[in-house]
Amino acid sequence: MEELNFDVVVVGGGPAGSSAAHMAAKNGCTVALIEKEKEIAETVRTSGVTWISDIKKFGIPEECYNPIKKFSFCSPKNSVKISGEIAKAAVLDVRKTYRFLANRAKTSGSELFTSTNVTEVLKD
């Protein structure tokens, strides 16, 4: 088996792992980003609405989200409606967003390993 050496090994190609890999590579580290699925976001278990200002802070491109001008938050005892002329929130295309983040990590220099399970951590 070929021996590979990296400064940083990130386990999990979700948004946190991909973002960590991106920042580490951007700052000069050699990085392995390890994902157990065959491809990033093969199995997505989340969705939702978030603020556009927060999306932009993470550099997520517009093609990864759908702006909305009206929405409601509902609970068993209360609801709040929010609307306006300018969209302040958006529904993320989670699969597209995760893949964008992983690709950004690769572009920064991280090496992506898919279909790879981490079963043990060995410290040198």
What are these regions (language model features)?
Residues 17-18:
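N-terminal Rossmann-fold NAD(P) dinucleotide-binding loop
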Residues 37-62:
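Conserved N-terminal glycine-rich FAD pyrophosphate-binding loop of Rossmann-like flavoproteins
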Residues 3-8:
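Extreme N-terminal starter segment of soluble prokaryotic enzymes
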Residues 9, 13, 22-45:
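Glycine-rich FAD pyrophosphate-binding loop
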